[in-house]
């Protein structure tokens, strides 16, 4: 969660004391922990048979409980223009399957408003993914800011709803959904251009490609051997007579092999490859 833009930044419309209070409400360690545990922000949510429908609000209830009196007191005191709005520019979800591709099933993922009893998709922000299509990335963009209010006994805010369909015979986890978003809070609101929900199918990760390439150890050995070979053909640092072609050919001539254990071999240890751990 973050505040962006001077016209939408609540901290510039209230006193420093209220700004500190707001920072504590939104960014304290406890608030961040609640965002993860209650809303699954940035965490993997497993879709199981015993949890076929998942409703995840984008704001924890404890945060809403703290924000409502903050906005109300500022509004009643004439410091704020409204009782507060929640704005979410975009919600991104990464979806992967955890069963075989031939499993018959699908996921319906959409953005809803908890102020709606039916929890219908807002502005057509709904995507259906069949099991064989996964993995995939999906995105949602609401067209309005949600008022921070109570509807009955429910705190109104946006929520990500995931429905699991099919997967007969699969009682365990069939898919994993990891959602990320950035909630903003302001005393001003707006409407936004409609954008259809996005669905991008992702190619599965080809981990076999890593094994088809030379390993790091093999590349290191190869580079060392190349350095050894090149060092044995370096010309000595002496002046050469351009007209003495016969003398040059003798210098460039490769020396005969040196027997292991001979005195000459000990003087040429610089040409031997180093030992790499693990080989």
UniProtKB/Swiss-Prot annotation:
Q: Where are the transmembrane segments?
A: none
Which GO BP terms apply? transport of virus in host, cell to cell
Biased composition (Polar residues) is annotated at 267-279
What's one Pfam family the UniProt record gives for this protein? 3A
GO cellular component terms, semicolon-separated: host cell plasmodesma
Record-linked InterPro entries: MPV
Positions of the UniProt region annotated as Disordered: 256-279
| Family per record | Belongs to the cucumovirus movement protein family.
Task: Name it.
Answer: Movement protein
């Amino acid at each position: 969660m973050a505040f962006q833009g001077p016209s939408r930044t609540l901290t510039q419309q209230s006193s420093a004391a209220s700004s500190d209070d707001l920072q504590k409400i939104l960014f304290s360690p406890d608030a961040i922990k609640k965002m993860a545990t209650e809303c699954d922000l940035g965490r993997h949510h497993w879709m199981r048979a015993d949890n076929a429908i998942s409703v995840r609000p984008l704001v924890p209830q404890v945060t809403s409980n703290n924000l409502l009196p903050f906005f109300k007191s500022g509004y009643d005191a004439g410091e704020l223009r409204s009782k507060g709005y929640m704005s979410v520019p975009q919600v991104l979800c990464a979806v992967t399957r955890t069963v075989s591709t031939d499993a018959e099933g699908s996921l319906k993922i959409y953005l809803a408003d908890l102020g709606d009893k039916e929890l219908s998709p807002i502005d057509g922000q709904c995507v259906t993914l069949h099991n064989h299509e996964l993995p995939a990335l999906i995105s949602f963009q609401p067209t309005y800011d949600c008022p921070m209010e109570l509807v009955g006994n429910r705190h109104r805010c946006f929520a990500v709803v995931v429905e699991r369909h099919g997967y007969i015979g699969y009682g365990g986890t069939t898919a994993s959904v990891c959602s990320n978003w950035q909630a903003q809070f302001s005393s001003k609101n707006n409407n936004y251009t409609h954008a259809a929900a996005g669905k991008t199918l992702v190619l599965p990760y080809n981990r076999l490609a890593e094994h088809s390439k030379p390993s790091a150890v093999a590349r290191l050995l190869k580079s060392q051997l190349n350095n050894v070979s090149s060092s044995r053909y370096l010309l000595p640092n002496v002046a050469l007579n351009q007209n003495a072609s016969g003398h040059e050919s003798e210098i460039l001539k490769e020396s005969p092999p040196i027997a292991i254990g001979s005195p000459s071999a000990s003087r040429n240890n610089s040409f031997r490859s180093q030992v790499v751990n693990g080989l």
